[in-house]
């Protein structure tokens, strides 16, 4: 299902019969100005401005998945770096000063990074994202960066916890005894054992990012109109919930199916890549 959604989003320009932002005059609206329902000309009808709804749903998939995958790449990269550095940095000692006045001090890198992660975890991320986007101005790139910059904490905690366990195992102790640097141990011996875990949670993170983007767009601080976005489509037609619920149900169902498909994909990957499952 996730692959089908990605294929539809990637081929939106080829599949969509109309420009998603083009208001079709004449046949795009009823004589009284209401949206047209599903027909042979318009597969899923039109919206309040006479734009083809099927075309907007397809391009909305592209927008939502672009933000979801892009934000998740940011979150996964930042979270992996923070968790990796925190698990192996410890509290390095530095010396400053001149001659007899040189002093040694330890910098608790591990503690600093993980306490900072806890602080970010405690923040109301939706309110913070709304504030950041409202101050700077909404755009596709900004929304992607903001979402990724707020969702990295879960990956950081997971990577940190797994690497703390791995660094005490015999193969890591042996590599350290042979003189391998912390950098080599991390990237050559430990990280390969964490990649499968990162892939699983990265897949689950796409679902969270898509839902996050839809929430921001619904509140008017996400992808700016007239760009097609499922959250924008729901927001634009909030007043049609009685007269034409199709305008709300279709993008809502698209969001639900996308989140569900990536959650199921993440669960399947976790079962397939879990070494304990196969004994």
Predicted feature locations:
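Alpha-helical transmembrane segments of integral membrane proteins
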Residues: 3, 49-279
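Short membrane-interfacial helix/loop motifs at transmembrane-helix boundaries
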Residues: 11-55
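N-terminal signal-anchor/first transmembrane alpha helix
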Residues: 1-23, 113-116, 194
